[in-house]
Curated annotation (Swiss-Prot):
Reaction(s) this enzyme catalyzes, per UniProt: K(+)(out) + ATP + H2O + H(+)(in) = K(+)(in) + ADP + phosphate + 2 H(+)(out)
Residues where K(+) binds: 339-340, 342, 344, 796, 821
Active-site residue list: 386 (4-aspartylphosphate intermediate)
GO MF annotation terms: ATP binding; ATP hydrolysis activity; magnesium ion binding; P-type potassium:proton transporter activity; P-type sodium:potassium-exchanging transporter activity; potassium ion binding
Assigned protein family: Belongs to the cation transport ATPase (P-type) (TC 3.A.3) family. Type IIC subfamily.
Compositional bias per record (Basic residues), positions renumbered to this chain: 26-39
Residues with Phosphoserine modification: 27, 462, 600, 839, 953
Residues noted as binding Mg(2+) in the record, renumbered to the chain: 386, 388, 727, 731
Pfam family, one: Hydrolase
Outcome, altering residue 821 to D: Has normal potassium-dependent ATPase activity
Protein name (Swiss-Prot/TrEMBL): Potassium-transporting ATPase alpha chain 1
Positions of the UniProt region annotated as Disordered: 13-40, 222-244
Organism this protein belongs to: Sus scrofa
Amino acid sequence: MGKAENYELYQVELGPGPSGDMAAKMSKKKAGRGGGKRKEKLENMKKEMEINDHQLSVAELEQKYQTSATKGLSASLAAELLLRDGPNALRPPRGTPEYVKFARQLAGGLQCLMWVAAAICLIAFAIQASEGDLTTDDNLYLALALIAVVVVTGCFGYYQEFKSTNIIASFKNLVPQQATVIRDGDKFQINADQLVVGDLVEMKGGDRVPADIRILQAQGRKVDNSSLTGESEPQTRSPECTHESPLETRNIAFFSTMCLEGTAQGLVVNTGDRTIIGRIASLASGVENEKTPIAIEIEHFVDIIAGLAILFGATFFIVAMCIGYTFLRAMVFFMAIVVAYVPEGLLATVTVCLSLTAKRLASKNCVVKNLEAVETLGSTSVICSDKTGTLTQNRMTVSHLWFDNHIHSADTTEDQSGQTFDQSSETWRALCRVLTLCNRAAFKSGQDAVPVPKRIVIGDASETALLKFSELTLGNAMGYRERFPKVCEIPFNSTNKFQLSIHTLEDPRDPRHVLVMKGAPERVLERCSSILIKGQELPLDEQWREAFQTAYLSLGGLGERVLGFCQLYLSEKDYPPGYAFDVEAMNFPTSGLSFAGLVSMIDPPRATVPDAVLKCRTAGIRVIMVTGDHPITAKAIAASVGIISEGSETVEDIAARLRVPVDQVNRKDARACVINGMQLKDMDPSELVEALRTHPEMVFARTSPQQKLVIVESCQRLGAIVAVTGDGVNDSPALKKADIGVAMGIAGSDAAKNAADMILLDDNFASIVTGVEQGRLIFDNLKKSIAYTLTKNIPELTPYLIYITVSVPLPLGCITILFIELCTDIFPSVSLAYEKAESDIMHLRPRNPKRDRLVNEPLAAYSYFQIGAIQSFAGFTDYFTAMAQEGWFPLLCVGLRPQWENHHLQDLQDSYGQEWTFGQRLYQQYTCYTVFFISIEMCQIADVLIRKTRRLSAFQQGFFRNRILVIAIVFQVCIGCFLCYCPGMPNIFNFMPIRFQWWLVPMPFGLLIFVYDEIRKLGVRCCPGSWWDQELYY
């Protein structure tokens, strides 16, 4: 058991001890288990991994891991280490049971309120049943209806939401199945999960790296780190330590990254959860989901509703006790008022409105996993976006060329209509020949009908870009190569930093060979003695070297990867046909070459991104780039897409312009700021928050997954609602921590998709703008729906208040209220989700979560005490009219309740002296229920029309633009008619046929509501910022 516990703690700590021995540090944390240490563990995982294996010599590595750089571990030691450390696999967390996920759907803010209301109804049912009250069943039906609403909406939410996020399960797809290992000097294949630290492993192109490995030997080794670090360009791996950071150095290969080409041999230095990828997985799964803004708003709303309900209930409980009711009867009244105050239909309204918006977004390639995330995107004030694959295409493309002493922009379109140089130029032909022949990439067969930019290429990103550019300019690059057969080649390696190949010429009458070379521009130039200018070889003197340096710096400053190209015709005399070229002996010249030109490449921005960033800026949303790529490249892309706006300068730019040291520049003068990972590592949280506050335009480069998470947290400390976009494994912790995580659907890793709340199916950053717009619109429309839904609470509540205090026969029954809440008013309420925006909501600043509430005081006051009061007057006017026309004048109704409800009294006289039996009185009471119901519905038609806008006149918005609302109103009227006049309704739901004139009584009140609201809106529009605006605009 001791070893098992050690393994568990080893995975939690993920750091070395003072001597560099990781196991020693694990034992120190042995007492740190338990829930109380979870936060500390998460903070430890946020820290950068402090390992020094990349800086140790081979002898020191052998000593540290008790291994051999030639024979590997002994089999016995490997077995001991496997027992100590456990398998080389990512340890999945304990999954959330499905019943718990479903239970969460039943326990939100509104759900809890409705559960309490249902419990109160059941208690009231029990009390009334014990007293023999005939209205007992109403409370039972109400309780069952409330429970049904919660369960049905819970099922709906559970169905809509994806299965629970399981971060580490998605990382399993990255784990290789087999690994080539050397133990006791013997080479054999084992399952990758059996690897241990100190194992000597071999890798080749096409393999996935089986663990974190310190490279000992490498030949042409390149790996794809894009999903881990965000770098589009393949990364060279070699035995040399090139950087003090283990994430930056070339002699560490990371677990799960893909080997693109070459071979390598190295020692395993970390396995399983202790690897970089394992650390990210643990970090992502350890981050708790934040409450969404809409969830916070609903909690705030529930607090308001519960507080008002208890206040009113307690007030009238005291009143009932004071006027002589028994305690149990007064308690029943208290419960009835509390339940009447609960908007039973609101939960369904909110769920359906969010679902409709989610469906609308899905049609625009945005899939929402969590319904509440729909509104969150609309509240977003900061977007932290990854660069590679999100803002850019994750596809290297030729961008510029320098030849004949001119820089040309490359046209990578099919028709080549934008090409800015003369393709008949001799220098261009030479440069094109070199970049086509000195290239190992090849098109996958059978793609002749596929457009060149979309063709699949076998090869690394740079050579792919060169091949596609060659295909676009030459027409048939592969056929062109066949005309120049390759006889010799030296692949690119980190020592030489060039690639060389020798070819025979296409002209059979010319028996010469041509040597072509590409590589790092400075390395290629130093092997040249001449330069091609307009097809002529000129001596490479100081003038041309300066011209080269100027062009090189210019292209490099754009954040582009620059390659140099040169050639040399080999004389027939020294290198006749059939000459045996030997790459080991290098029996051919590698100097005295002729420089042809420079080609620069970049992972270009998506075409729609600049416009999307501009729209975000217009909408008051700050876009921050957070990438693992180089600072120069990151800054260049940020400038090209508008994250760094034209004219904005960093501290370094200002210092260069003023020709002063950087430390003499006032940092507050710099609008833009580029911070790399090493700088970020040395900053404390307060410094980072201050930098975010000082510089509106921010770019973070060379960041680790831990740092991305810290950046998100810092933005949240400033009060921002943060959206994070990303596609790589390295983005998953930040995606989980953000208020809303947005993953790429095509290029995104499974880990990123699982951590996110929303997935962009088309990988288009511009789709986020659509999401923001829809999110803002649904917030506005939810506000309207809630205002509409709350208004009728007052005419539903006041009958009970009058019933208790004035002792009139009950004007409105529980079942009738249920039909209002869950039947007739649901459709108009939902139809407001289809309402168009009143103005260009993308020109407004994001809402302030602390100030701009979903349900604020003006909304509650206006809905309850103004429109709700008018509806109550309408209802009582219709009620007393119906009672009077049947012989019960208003003054007689006051205090009538005890006799009216006495089922033993069969001869109660009305105002005309007519005697009424209990059955007749009950029939009249049900008629009054129906009259009050119709009155509310007629006023609610006016209410839904005024809710179309909050500021504009309803005439400006148009009555018939929202056809769904028109249909909902017609449906509402039809339902009302059906309930009133369908045979059998009196016996089933207590609805009675009513006279036509009783439909007309509430209409003047509906007109009053409409006129009153138009006056309110006029004042809001005419007096912005005034008392009228502040108190009456909700």
